[in-house]
Amino acid sequence: MTQLSMHSPVGDLTLSQDDGAIVAIDWGWAPMQSATGLLTEAKAQLDAYFDGALTVFDLPLRPAGTAFQRAVYDVMTSIPYGKTMTYAEVAQKVGSVARAVGGVCGSNPIPIVIPCHRVVAAPGRTPGHRVAGTLGGYSGHGGVDTKRALLRLEGADGPGRQLDLNLSMS
């Protein structure tokens, strides 16, 4: 496995690849790095995403996980840039429940590229004891503030959208 770290508006990221596919994006900086063509391309695509110039990633991905987790990852990658889907909507697509989908989102090994930040709680719900409102949680660096920043970057709270990114998450 090889890794490449990069700075981003939501914190330092370390990209990992193995056998020609991206297998992880972790928060933080890796002490040992080795740039490969794939990692350089992944960094370029992430830079373009953060600059607002890329809305669809085109990278080979191989996230670890069960068949259920991979099914949830597939649904998440189908959510268009700037759009959101509720945990319950994702659950319906994979024949499960919202809480299980939330668990998969929380263990997503390739955040941003597999856009778990686009999965939100249903309006008017209070999911779990840690979060309230319509955003749901976010286990990545910076928590819900990072989720909010990614959704704002994508314009998910723009005119005609029903997502309120100004919610208090306490």
Where are these regions (language model features)?
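Basic nucleic-acid-binding alpha-helical/helix-turn surface characteristic of O6-alkylguanine DNA
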Residues: M1-S96, D145-S170
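Short, amphipathic alpha-helical segments
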Residues: G95, I110, G140-V144
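Hydrophobic alpha-helical packing residues
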Residues: C116-H117, L150
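Short active-site segment of divalent metal-dependent hydrolases/proteases
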Residues: V120
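DPxDG-like acidic metal-binding loop motif
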Residues: P123-L135, S139-D145, L151
